Amino acid sequence: MGELSEYRQGCGHPEQLTFETSMEFRRINNLPPYVFSIINGLKIEARRAGADVIDLGFGNPDIPSPQIAVDKLCEAAQNPKNHRYSLSRGLPKLREAAAALYERKWGVTLDPELEITNTIGSKEGFSHLMWVLLDRGDAAIVPSPSYPIHIYGPLFAGADLRQVPMRHLADPRVQDFETDFFDSLTTAYDVGWPRPKVLIISFPHNPTGAVVDLVFMQKVVDFCRERDMIVVHDFAYADMGYDGYEPPSILQAEGAKECAVELYSMTKSFSMAGWRSAFLVGNAEVVQALVKLKSYLDYGMFQPVQIAATVTMNEAPDFPKEVCAIYKGRRDALIDGLAKIGWDIPKPKGSMFVWAPIPEPYKDMDSVEFCSHIVRECDVALSPGLGFGPGGEGFIRFALIENEQRIAQGIRNLKRGLTKLG
């Protein structure tokens, strides 16, 4: 059937195998090339050769989860009753805790029975949500650049994807991207047939770190209500706002529940990446449609994880502030350090990433070539902008997943290898 050629670990994706086969897997074979695997392969090769590669590519949180979550998980796992199948939509107390969190932080009232469902991480929730919202031949609008699953999810559902290059959104030096964003959005909706059914957004934005206010969210809601569209807001960085900025929930906008759903995850806010605890909240019809689909696909998360997540949201509500402060320190260390070696980048006000244009002396390289050069010459792994869609070409992404001392070492490595800077 095939020959196993090489093992590679994906960047933010499950472990991947490069495997040659004569069999036809249409849904898989039609996916775009996964460019992160190139950098991962070089990183693995360098580490096997003994290099100390500083990984600022994969957005995998390194901050320990709350101790209360760990303790409650261990306690709940001792009870055999918790070893059985659970509810695919999550325990009632878990959904009630999520509702309380939204009320407390954003003043949004949610019905735990109808407007909240637990998902096994936001990627699982988003991917299956696309199955609910889109059929073959439907269209979805996705800004470019975007988080890769926002691109792949509609394709898995068989939909047509309209990646809208957002030139101002992509450039961190442009602070006001709103006019360009809505002009591009309107054009994407008006051109072609069928009319798009779904808009996918995420703010604070991955990969660019761009942020928006509630006025922007209201315009998104109004845009979608006028066109009978559903807007899906991936709120992965809900608790990561810097320099006085606080990210708004799209559900704070007037009329949002008529057309909007939002994904909230404990991955970044509570540094619980491997726990896979997230929620879809908002429009009851959409939420309940996902509940029905999930009832055929899974039996929910391991119940001790649900119990631990419930207790954590209720009893450690300030933990996200501690996490945010750590990422802010790392952001400042990275950007201040880069400025000292001649690479000036504006400080993003949100997310756990820093998005940067390729420095002028290296503009002859595309983003994959530049990141490959960085791994080979600097022992630093970054993410090429092309991996986030065509609108990301010419840029690279730093993930703030090393401590400040390691970031400082990374800066020294970059100074050594990027000889054209200065």
Spans of features found by a protein language model:
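PLP-dependent class I/II
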Residues: 4-24, 29-34, 39-54, 59-76, ...
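Glycine-rich loop-to-alpha-helix module at the N-terminal edge of alpha/beta enzyme cores
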Residues: 56, 79-85, 97-104
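Conserved AMP-binding/adenylate-forming core of the ANL superfamily
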Residues: 94-98, 121
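Short beta-strand to alpha-helix junction loop
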Residues: 89-90
